């Protein structure tokens, strides 16, 4: 398992992110808030996690929504997946949005998202006159049907 250094600046009682099952790809991350926050319909907010991390070079952390919050309450994230770069050292925060028609209250220590550690590789673009051809060609959105 890859080790990632973390500086914790969380409120008392807020748990560190953890994998909820043995096969989980993402670690559930919690709201580092002292008091409940109520999001009105279509409102968005930046929720602190209380964590600063030192991601190893060549990796990123992706910030993703939790499927249960999305299907049950219409709560998801903007800028999904969000990328945390290896050279960022500030507090990790999550952009939460309420897409439902009803207000939703985020409680202190509530699981609000997931962190997934991914290996990345930087690329360099090389300008060419023509690209090699493929069977698909330039067929884009909806090219395979419904």
From Swiss-Prot:
Key word Hydrolase present: yes
Function: This enzyme is involved in nucleotide metabolism: it produces dUMP, the immediate precursor of thymidine nucleotides and it decreases the intracellular concentration of dUTP so that uracil cannot be incorporated into DNA.
GO molecular function, one term: magnesium ion binding
InterPro entries noted in UniProt: dUTPase (IPR008181), dUTPase-like (IPR029054), dUTPase-like_sf (IPR036157), dUTPase_trimeric (IPR033704)
Tree of life domain: Bacteria
GO BP terms: dUMP biosynthetic process; dUTP catabolic process
Protein's name according to its UniProt entry: Deoxyuridine 5'-triphosphate nucleotidohydrolase
Class of this enzyme: hydrolase
Keyword terms, alphabetized: Hydrolase, Magnesium, Metal-binding, Nucleotide metabolism
SUPFAM superfamilies: dUTPase-like
UniProt pathway annotation: Pyrimidine metabolism; dUMP biosynthesis; dUMP from dCTP (dUTP route): step 2/2
Recorded name of the encoding gene: dut
EC numbers, comma separated: 3.6.1.23
Reactions accelerated catalytically: dUTP + H2O = dUMP + diphosphate + H(+)
Required cofactor(s): Mg(2+)
Residues annotated to bind substrate: 66-68, 79, 83-85, 93
Family: Belongs to the dUTPase family.
Membrane-spanning segments: none
């Amino acid at each position: 398992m890859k080790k990632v250094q973390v500086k914790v600046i969380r409120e008392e009682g807020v748990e560190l992110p953890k994998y909820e099952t043995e096969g989980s790809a993402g670690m559930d991350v919690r709201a580092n808030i002292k008091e409940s926050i109520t999001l009105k319909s279509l409102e968005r907010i930046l929720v602190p996690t209380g964590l600063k991390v030192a991601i190893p070079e060549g990796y990123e952390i992706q910030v993703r929504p939790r499927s249960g919050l999305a299907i049950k309450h219409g709560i998801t994230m903007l800028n999904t997946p969000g990328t945390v770069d290896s050279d960022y050292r500030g507090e990790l925060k999550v952009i939460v949005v309420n897409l439902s028609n009803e207000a939703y209250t985020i409680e202190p220590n509530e699981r609000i998202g997931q962190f997934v550690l991914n290996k990345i590789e930087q690329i360099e673009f090389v300008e060419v006159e023509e690209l090699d051809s493929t069977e698909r060609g330039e067929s884009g959105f909806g090219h395979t049907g419904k």
